[in-house]
Structures are given as structure tokens and as C-alpha cells.
Amino acid sequence: MTPRFPSLRRGLLAPAIGVLLVTAYACASGRHDDRAAAGRNDPTSSAPYQAEVEEGLGAAVAILIDTSGSMSQNAPGDQRSKYVVAQEAVEAMLDATDAFVTRRPDFPIKIGLYSFSSSVHTLRPIQPYDRDAIRSALAKLPRPGGGTGIGDALREARPDLYRAGVFRKYLLVVTDGENTHGSEPEAVAREIWGKSEGAVQVYFVAFDTSPEKFAFLKDVGGDVIGAGTGGELRTALDGIYTGKILAEAVDAGEREPAKK
């Protein structure tokens, strides 16, 4: 009897070809996903940002604090440096957050803390609100030095908002000067506004500097408030954080965004 090896080979070959085709498709699909992700993170791409996790009710706030060299100067009318005054003003925001989470335990608040000068440091990535953890991160704020890289800070913190798992996303910047290092903040703010399709709101507090430098924010759904003293800085931060961010987040959060 003649051995039936050719039939056996054909029987083995068909599944092997199927495996190869599936593997090739998976590799191609993976490359496509990688290219798509790269496009979303490429400043020159028009691809919209995509959430990296499923999103639900809540708000994520990335707080960006200027630690450039000029922040070592005394705050107007104060014997303390602008760096220390800003640190204390941000810490004062925690009282408002405590009150909010007590009143609305059903509405998740996530906060991240970043510093920027000629480089950007993530002191605490965006995580569920924890007063002690944020105070600990504030204590690690780098000493002032270097240039002012506002645009780079916006671009660095933005992706963390899309890992937070909440619909409402905010960038809150405290700075005492104009950009002197890296990407221009106006270009980055416009990029974020366009590619987030308005989902990311950007707010600035111009501390001991003219808010007119950041007037472009009003064109991209954000805002800027000037503050000349430590007291004004606290008032400005409270106005933005409590009066705008928390109020807007809850109002928008009552209505889940339409699925695309």
C-alpha cells in the first residue's frame, strides 16, 4: 500500500498556514495601534486624544507649579519667596477639596501634582484625592532654579488626565512669568483644546506677572486670573478651583457625555 504522506502533509499544512495568517494579522494590527497611539501623541498629528481606560463620573486635576529661578524672589509685600507662598496657597486648596468630597462622596476627585522649570517633575501622578499624600508631594517641591517651561509642563501632564478614568479633565497652572524654555504654551494649549475636543480645560494663575501674557486661554475654553500678592493668589486659586473646576465638573458630571 502506498503511504499517504502527501495527504498528511496537507492536513498539517492548513492549520499552520492559518496560524501564520492570524499571527501576521495580529502583528499588523499591533503596528496599526502603535501608529495610531503615536499619532495621538504627536504634536503635528490631528488625531484626537483617546482615553486609555474606561471613563466615568468624576474630575481629574493636574496642578502645575512654577519652580523656575524667579520663584525664589520675595512675593510682593511679603518676606517669603513666591515659591513658598505658592506652595502654601496650593495646600490651602485641600480644605476646599475636603469639604467637597464630604459633600459629594459619590463624585470622585483625582489630583496630580507637577513642578516645572527647565524640566518637568511628576511629584504625584493623578490619583484619587488623598490629603496626606498631596501634602507629602508638596513638601518635595524642588527648590527654584532654571527657566520656565510652561508648554512642556502642559504637554507632560496631559496624558495622565487620559489615564484617570473620569470625564472631566483640568490643567491648573501657577506661574510668575512667561515661557523661556521649550514649547510655547499657546501652541500647546491650542493643541490640547483641539485634540481633546474641548474635554481638557486649562486654567492659569499669573502670580506677580501680567495675565495678558496668557490671554489666548480664553480662545481655547480656559481662563487666566492675575494675582499680585500671596492673599490674591489664594483668592485666585479658590476662585478657579472651587468656583470653576469643581462647580463645572459636577454640573457636567450630572450628564454623562454622549457616546461617539
Tell what function each PLM region has.
Residues G226-K260:
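C-terminal "exit" segments of structured domains
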Residues C27-P76, P128, R155, E254-R255:
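Acidic, polar low-complexity linker/tail segments
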Residues Q50-A51, M71-V84, V120-P125, L138-G147, ...:
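Second-shell loop/turn segments in exported
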Residues N74, F100-K140, I150, D160-A164, ...:
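Short beta-strand-loop
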Residues A14-A24:
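Bacterial N-terminal signal peptides
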Residues E54-R124, A153-L154, Y170-V174, T209:
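Von Willebrand factor
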Residues T2-A16:
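Bacterial N-terminal signal peptides that target proteins for export
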Residues L141-G147, G151, G177-G239:
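VWA/integrin I-like adhesion module and closely mimicked acidic/polar interface patches used
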